[in-house]
Amino acid sequence: MSSSAEMPASGVCFDETLLELRSQDGWQHSNGAWWLEAKALDPRAMTSFMLAHEARLVTVASMEREAGETRLDYHWDLKGVVLTFSTITRAGSFPSIADLCPGADWIEREVHEYFAVEFTGRDNTKPLMLRSGLLPGLNRKQGAKL
């Protein structure tokens, strides 16, 4: 990823509230989006901040990592600019944001089924596409988690 000292890109004007995202904290511009590696990300604080600024959750991309963890890339659209917060699960789990952002419900259920991520704080993780009797983790190299 190429780094840039200043947000924004593409001539988009951000208001002062976006300065809270602090480009000096490691934001990098790549593939048409701004990315921030945030291993210690508080997803609930991030979600509250983004929603307060009228951002829209686009999706959460996931990828298996070493030691049974899963990388989670939270993609947000903020005034036409994509901001991505990249983080990693902790002991196979991560706090849910579905109660704050209902659009995350489907995404979290899908990530749970494909990568066996346990989203803590959810009232219910009912099956989305997983057939009865199958264990979550269908996309993990080691297969489903037992």
Feature-to-residue mapping (PLM):
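Terminal low-complexity/charged segments
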Residues: M1-L146
